[in-house]
């Protein structure tokens, strides 16, 4: 999931009709050069991370994210990374309950948990697991 969310996107340069003639040449030497340099650094760090066989979770959040569009945005890297961290926690939590329920009923199901069949939507499974674990 983290690989997909942090994957670098292609740069979207501004159309030529939104810049003046002299501005286009100036942008080429200043804005575009720095932007492409930042984007290449993002790509480099992304692929160096995945060359490592088993990167730690903290390495995922050390990657600097580069803007891919020329339009102004209110994107905040820290909020984005915080959201990714909570998605990881939710996934880990749902799989933990899923495996506890599967082990508690005496059989293990190897299919992945989908959003529609999340163990959190089925309270009977969670309650039966809790009662077996506590012995009540």
From Swiss-Prot:
Subcellular location: Mitochondrion
Cellular component, GO annotation: mitochondrion
Main location: mitochondrion
Miscellaneous remark of the record: A stretch of 270 kb of the mitochondrial genome is duplicated within the centromere of chromosome 2 resulting in the duplication of the gene. The expression of this duplicated gene (At2g07691) is demonstrated.
Entry keyword Mitochondrion: yes
Keyword tags: Mitochondrion
Top-rank lineage group of the source organism: Eukaryota
Protein name, UniProt field: Uncharacterized mitochondrial protein AtMg01310
């Amino acid at each position: 999931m983290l690989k997909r969310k942090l994957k670098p996107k292609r740069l979207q340069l501004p159309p030529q009709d939104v810049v003046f003639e002299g501005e286009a040449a100036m942008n080429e030497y200043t804005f575009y050069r720095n932007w492409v340099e930042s984007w290449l650094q993002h790509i480099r760090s992304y692929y160096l991370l995945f060359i490592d066989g088993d990167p730690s979770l903290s390495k995922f959040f050390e990657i600097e994210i580069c803007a891919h569009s020329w339009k102004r945005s209110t994107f905040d890297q820290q909020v984005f990374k915080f959201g990714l961290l909570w998605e990881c926690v939710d996934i880990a939590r749902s799989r933990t309950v899923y495996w506890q329920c599967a082990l508690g009923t005496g059989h293990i199901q190897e299919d992945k948990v989908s959003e529609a069949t999340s163990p959190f939507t089925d309270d009977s499974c969670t309650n039966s697991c809790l009662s077996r674990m506590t012995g009540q």
